[in-house]
Amino acid sequence: MPQLNGGGGDDLGANDELISFKDEGEQEEKNSENSSAERDLADVKSSLVNESETNQDSSSDSEAERRPPPRSESFRDKSRESLEEAAKRQDGGLFKGPPYPGYPFIMIPDLTSPYLPNGSLSPTARTYLQMKWPLLDVQAGSLQSRQTLKDARSPSPAHIVSNKVPVVQHPHHVHPLTPLITYSNEHFTPGNPPPHLPADVDPKTGIPRPPHPPDISPYYPLSPGTVGQIPHPLGWLVPQQGQPVYPITTGGFRHPYPTALTVNASMSRFPPHMVPPHHTLHTTGIPHPAIVTPTVKQESSQSDVGSLHSSKHQDSKKEEEKKKPHIKKPLNAFMLYMKEMRAKVVAECTLKESAAINQILGRRWHALSREEQAKYYELARKERQLHMQLYPGWSARDNYGKKKKRKRDKQPGETNEHSECFLNPCLSLPPITDLSAPKKCRARFGLDQQNNWCGPCSL
């Protein structure tokens, strides 16, 4: 290898020095032109989006569409090369067609119009829905072009890289639920639009043009292995296996298709598992009366019916008892004597109180001899026989039972003004049960023992 002499070193310079050629300067000029063209394109596209959002006049829209974006030949060449590389990766890479027909596709059409008036593909085709699964970047351009597109839009989160596939957040002017996510068994041809949609017509030439280039499919099929592994951010929208999913479109969302094709906003067509859960509690935590389960309602209704039935039964018993006449027990010998001699005692004495009259009759009864009392005992025996013939099934316990029931029916809060008679410790006689007549202490103790009277009787 020939060696250079020391004299020529000053002319050539150091060995590690970089020598610039004319081609490198031309490349820098091309890069500057490309960056300026991309900035102009982003400005034009943002103005188009703003005009479409504010629904301005058709004249302003047509002027914005007729405005030609400055583009260079080198940028078009780069976009074509990137499209060819993406098509090759899609044919031989991860996202191949399904191995068997009928496997559901996930189809994500463009959020806005992906084509400019001159028929070229706009950078919005590279934006994706805000989801957490990896999608194939169709236009895998250089890192510089993606960075300029990101800077032209509103600030968005950093790229989420999963298996070296970038996922970019969509711009702020598009609603996250705008794209149409459907599962279908039909295959869509890459170059032909759906039959129910009108063809896109060029405003300048009037010739219909296809919405997508023929070499790129507008829908991205997912392989069977990746569908089950992708976590869906909208959990209640993910269908279960074997169940169809309906389009998610409402009138309030932006959609690139005519409004006549939008689906009604009501969720009546959704399966039950897709409807989001609703809160059934008030702010206080008490369930709404219309949301009470049928079992609770049945139990409450059964308890109400049982209580009504028991109350009706008790009312019927009370009515029957009222209808039955009160049967008095047969008079004994002393009662027969009192019945006969009461008028004579009242005529002889000036006392008008029954208690004093009863005391006088009692003294006279005990003063009678056995033979005189035997007459009244015989009358009492005949009275009992007659009573047994008239009321064969009668017993004195029937009347006592009624009195007990009356005591039970009384409420514990009820009080009587003669209650002090029961609490008087000086009383040696049994308590008085009949409280309807006043002045019981006077009849019991008499006027001589007023110190034993209760409070109400002493008044």
Curated annotation (Swiss-Prot):
Extent of Gly residues compositional bias: 1-11
Modified how: Phosphorylated at Thr-178 and/or Thr-189 by NLK. Phosphorylation by NLK at these sites inhibits DNA-binding by TCF7L2/TCF4, thereby preventing transcriptional activation of target genes of the canonical Wnt/beta-catenin signaling pathway. Polysumoylated. Sumoylation is enhanced by PIAS family members and desumoylation is enhanced by SENP2. Sumoylation/desumoylation regulates TCF7L2/TCF4 transcription activity in the Wnt/beta-catenin signaling pathway without altering interaction with CTNNB1 nor binding to DNA.
Main location: nucleus
Disulfide bonds listed in the record: none
PROSITE patterns assigned to the protein according to its UniProt record, in alphabetical order: HMG_BOX_2
Tree of life domain: Eukaryota
GO cellular component, one term: cytosol
Function: Participates in the Wnt signaling pathway and modulates MYC expression by binding to its promoter in a sequence-specific manner. Acts as a repressor in the absence of CTNNB1, and as activator in its presence. Activates transcription from promoters with several copies of the Tcf motif CCTTTGATC in the presence of CTNNB1. TLE1, TLE2, TLE3 and TLE4 repress transactivation mediated by TCF7L2/TCF4 and CTNNB1. Expression of dominant-negative mutants results in cell-cycle arrest in G1. Necessary for the maintenance of the epithelial stem-cell compartment of the small intestine.
Subunit composition and interactions: Interacts with TGFB1I1. Interacts with SPIN1. Interacts with CTNNB1 (via the armadillo repeat); forms stable transcription complex. Interacts with EP300. Interacts with NLK. Interacts with CCDC85B (probably through the HMG box); prevents interaction with CTNNB1. Interacts with TNIK. Interacts with MAD2L2; prevents TCF7L2/TCF4 binding to promZIPK/DAPK3oters, negatively modulating its transcriptional activity. Interacts with ZIPK/DAPK3. Interacts with XIAP/BIRC4 and TLE3. Interacts with DDIT3/CHOP. The CTNNB1 and TCF7L2/TCF4 complex interacts with PML (isoform PML-4).
Name of this protein: Transcription factor 7-like 2
